Amino acid sequence: MIEITEFIKKYMTALDQAFPDRVWFAGLQGSYGRGEATEASDIDMVVILDQLSASDIRTYDAMLDTLPCRELICGFLSGRQELENWEPSELFQFCRDTTPIRGSLDQVLSSVTSADIARAIKSGACGVYHGCVHNMLYEKSEDILKGLYKSASFVLQAVHFQRTGVYVRHMADLVSVLPPEESAVLQTFMELKNGGAAVFDAMSE
């Protein structure tokens, strides 16, 4: 597995060389950000520049080509203004799930309201519902099913926050504080993530 601390040092050095004095925020999302990475985990880097042009995207792409494990690097690249004008319901978990390396997303997160969080939950739940029905009827894909459980886990994070005002970032902690029916969904997601077999019909239900 990647030694993430060493990787980040190399990454930030390359980023500063590519964009001197232009990095407003840099952070780490996903499994590595939560300390839940496996051998198959991507490295989800978040970079917010002072502004972003097509030329900047090409520069960033060339920068990534100089780094180890290029095939594992993914994430989010944006300009500051674009992020500040993003759909607020998407910013809730985007900000909460990002471990800062440089800068802060607190200003962005402060614009998110309880109505935005409710919209994120509803939109996420609708997406999971439609995805499950579509997959059972047409795709019949275990990979899609696993992705739906991942999406459901983020919905449950938001639901718990809406109920309690507490954002539980780590799934292993969240599973113990959810009601039994919701906890079972999260437990299944964690088993699938750790290499467990997908039982298509039962897990689709």
Where are these regions (language model features)?
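Conserved nucleotidyltransferase catalytic core and NTase-mimicking acidic/glycine-rich helix/loop elements
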Residues: 9, 104, 110-205
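Short, flexible, glycine/charge-rich loop motifs used to bind or transfer phosphoryl groups or to couple energy/partner
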Residues: 16-17, 34-36, 141
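Secondary-structure boundary/capping positions in well-ordered alpha/beta enzyme cores
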Residues: 22, 70-71, 181
